[in-house]
Amino acid sequence: MKSLEPILDVFQPGLKRGAARLPFAPHKRYFYVEHPTEGWRVYLRACTFLHEAGQPFQASRFLVVKKFGANASQKTWEPPKGQMEAKDTSPKKSVLKLLHENVQREVEEESKVQSFQNLRHTGMVFQGREPDYPENHFFQYHIFQAYVTPEEIENALLEFEWLNEHPKAFARLRKDKREKDDLSWFSPRSTRLMGRWSPSIVAMYIHKYE
């Protein structure tokens, strides 16, 4: 469920850092920050809205990716997003820097877009709680924005086309790189949003900028 709590400040100094295995993916360790006295814990996630460089800005025109093997006409699309894992963190880097690096990795893995411009944190945060979270545990999606050239979009589409034509090669990719199998511009009718959180995140983003 979406949290009714105030948005917690994960950038404040003095927070503890750690990682935990969660029931839905016990083989991974997910990064969190925790307040040393108040006791709240936040698992960090990011969602990135990729717009076309050189075109007039339209909040509702952004790239989405499709869940691997799923029916494109169903609720199987979302902007590139993901959770920060322990392996992607460093105690010497700020939380904001770690989020930026996580976005760069997730965007490349999910959308095959390898180069984008003007990546920035929008200041928007979607905070919630998973049903199996202990009391005072939360997640936050930090909302990023970036711009992609038409050439880079075409390269990503060609890579997806090649991978879908060569399923054995696709299957050999690391699991994180084969979670999605198509790329498109968002359309409420033809690229319907998947999952519990993506529809709310997209609605929040469009509402802010339109």
At which residue positions do the language-model features occur?
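Conserved beta-strand and immediately adjacent loop positions that scaffold enzyme active sites
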Residues: C47, R61, D182
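Nudix hydrolase/Nudix homology domain
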Residues: A72-T76, P80-G82, H137, I143-Q145, ...
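Acidic, metal-coordinating catalytic segment for phosphate/diphosphate chemistry
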Residues: K2-P56, A70
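Short, P/G- and charge-enriched loop/turn segments at secondary-structure junctions
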Residues: Y30-G39, E130-Y133, K168-L173
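Short hydrophobic/aromatic beta-strand or adjacent loop that forms the aromatic wall/cage
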Residues: Y43-C47, F138-I143
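Conserved Nudix-box catalytic region and its N-terminal flanking loop in Nudix hydrolases
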Residues: F57-V113
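Residue-level signal for short segments within beta-strands and strand-turn junctions
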Residues: L50-E52, K66, Y147-P150
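A short coil-to-beta-strand element that immediately follows conserved catalytic motifs
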Residues: Q114-V125
